[in-house]
Each structure stands twice: as C-alpha cells, then as structure tokens.
Swiss-Prot record:
Amino acid composition bias (Low complexity), ranges on this chain: 18-32
Domain of life (superkingdom): Bacteria
Enzyme class name: transferase
Residues covered by the CoA carboxyltransferase N-terminal domain: 55-312
Residues annotated to bind Zn(2+): C59, C62, C78, C81
Record note on cofactor: Binds 1 zinc ion per subunit.
Keywords (A to Z) from UniProt: ATP-binding, Cytoplasm, Fatty acid biosynthesis, Fatty acid metabolism, Lipid biosynthesis, Lipid metabolism, Metal-binding, Nucleotide-binding, Transferase, Zinc, Zinc-finger
Zn finger spans (C4-type): 59-81
GO CC, one annotated term: acetyl-CoA carboxylase complex
Reactions this protein catalyses: N(6)-carboxybiotinyl-L-lysyl-[protein] + acetyl-CoA = N(6)-biotinyl-L-lysyl-[protein] + malonyl-CoA
Originating gene: accD
Protein name: Acetyl-coenzyme A carboxylase carboxyl transferase subunit beta
Length: 312
C-alpha cells in the first residue's frame, strides 16, 4: 500500500490567506503579543572612536606614551626620560637661531647624477623623491644668522635626506659657508645629524668632499676663526671622520651615536663584543673625544657663551 508522505506546508494559503510559519524570516511579521516593541538600538554612539593622528607619540627610549604638543614644547625631548628625538634641519634653525635672522645660502646648488647610479631605483629618481618628502634640496642647510644677537655662519645636516649623507652639493655648500665665515670673521656653527657618511651614489666625488671641507676648515683656523661642532644622533661615517670632528669646541647631545662604522657593522665584521655604551656621547666624553654634552634646551645659551668667552 502506497503511503502518502507529503507534509503540509505551513505557509500554504488556507481560505485564501497565508498561514504564519514558525520558520519564516520575513521582516514584516507581526511582533509576538508578549514581546515589547523596542526601538532599534543606537549603535552610533557606542562606536569606539580612534585617537586622531598627531596627538600622542611613543618614546623610542622608555616607551612612554607622550602628548605630542608637550614633546614639541620641550624641543622634542621626552619629559619622562630626556630622550632627544629627531628634529628636522628647519626645526634646528628655529631652536638655535634668533627668530627671523636666518639667511640661507647657495640653495640654488642642486645635486645631479653624474655616475647614473642605480640600486633599487636610479639616484636621480631617489633625489626627486627625497626632495618632495623632506622639502629640502639636499641634506644640509647653510646660511648666516644670529644667536643671542651674535652673527654666525650656520649649517645643519638632516638625517631624513638620504641619511644626511655628504655628496658633492653638501660639500660645496659647507665649503662656501666656511669661506664666508673666513672672509667676514664669523664664528662657525655646524650641527651634524648624518648617519650616512659619504654618499655612495656619487662615488669618489662624495669622498673628495671630506678633504675639500677639511681644507677649508684649515684655512679658517689659520685665520683665527672659532668653529663649534655639535654632534647629534646619529653622526657617523665620512662626516664624523672629517669636519664634524674638527671643531675647536665639540659639543654633543645626550646619548647620541657618534663614530665611523656602527656597532652592528663592527660586531659583524670583526666578531667581538663591544664595550657598554660604545660610541655614545657619554662614552666619548669619558675618553676625551668630545668637550661637553649639552642638553638641547641649553644649546643656544652654551654656544653664545662660548662665542663670548672666545672673543668672537
């Protein structure tokens, strides 16, 4: 005997009207009699709001979360551990020179690509990218300005532009600045922030700048000039091996990395453990390489005092 296995569809019309289904997902179904008719929850007010960019920053040294404006007011120094953050060349100008006194020199000198050097991209393309990203035409700003009403020749390198490396334009700008200081009997202040040394993209042309700038400094010294060199983090390679180490007075910011090859390179090359704090400002002060460690907030005053003391 054949068995009828059909099951009545609960949604089939009866008497011309659809029957409610317990499995129906229709959104217009009437609410259950006993359920309260609640409004839809307001989820907009409960959304987690992200912290806007540029409000907080993390200290590279102690890891503290810092209010960005407070760090800026302290000249980009951590209020917790005194770590000195990177600052750009233009920020250095604002921190050290009297307001509105900086007169840039030789900004028309621009680097070229005489060797048509290429690594991951061409040197010419790299230069254009760095200029757009940093707003600088090369890794050094040079010019004249006032420090506590004392006129000086002033230069600052910027590690953001190809690690602050010294190419032919950096060397030429520095040489012309030193010659101006010699002619006008100005104190010379160079703040170094160069982790790249001589710029490999220009080959021997960049290495020649070490000798050229050093020779200009020799003539400046012979004329009785006062050169104050300020070393910041990092000052390495050909910059440290030439003009940055030739100051009559050599100041350094706290805990700056200063040397020729970096600690990792030395360890990988000769395979020895380096002394604790090797190549830091504190280590170099202890061993007589620098004259004084100067906190960023005191740098302007220390330079002005040194100029007065030396009669410049």
């Amino acid at each position: 005997m054949e068995m009828d296995t059909a099951v009545e569809n609960p949604a089939v019309e009866k008497n011309g009207q659809p029957t409610p289904s317990s499995t129906s997902t229709a959104t217009d179904a009437a609410p259950t009699p006993n359920a309260p008719n609640r409004p839809a929850p307001n989820t907009a007010g409960n959304r987690k709001r992200g912290v806007p960019e540029g409000v907080w920053r993390k200290c590279d040294s102690c890891g503290a979360s810092l209010f960005y404006k407070e760090v800026q007011q302290r000249l980009n120094v951590c209020p917790q551990c005194d770590h000195h953050f990177y600052v750009s060349a233009w920020e250095r100008v604002a921190q050290v020179l009297d307001d509105g006194t900086f007169e840039p020199m030789n900004e028309h000198l621009r680097p070229t690509d005489p060797l048509e050097f290429r690594d991951r991209r061409s040197y010419a393309e790299r230069l254009v990218g760095e200029q757009k990203r940093t707003g600088l035409t090369d890794a050094v700003l040079t010019g004249t300005g006032m420090i506590r009403a004392r006129r000086v020749a002033f230069a600052v390198t910027d590690s953001a532009f190809i690690m602050g490396s010294m190419g032919s334009v950096v060397g030429e700008r520095l040489t012309r600045l030193i010659e101006r200081a010699t002619e006008q009997n100005l104190a010379l202040i160079i703040i170094s922030a160069s982790g790249g040394g001589a710029r490999m993209h220009e080959g021997i042309l960049s290495l020649m700048q070490m000798a050229k700038v050093s020779a200009a400094l020799s003539r400046y010294h012979a004329a009785g000039g006062l050169f104050i060199s300020v070393l910041t983090n990092p000052t390495m390679g050909g910059v440290a091996a030439s003009f940055a180490s030739l100051g009559d007075l050599v100041f350094a910011e706290p805990k700056a990395l200063i040397g020729f090859a970096g600690p990792r390179t030395i360890k990988a090359t000769i395979g020895i453990e380096l002394p604790e704090g090797f190549q830091t400002s504190e280590f170099l002060l202890e061993h007589g390489y620098i004259d004084r460690i100067v906190h960023r907030k005191s740098l302007k005053t220390e330079i002005a005092t040194a100029i007065d003391y030396c009669g410049k």
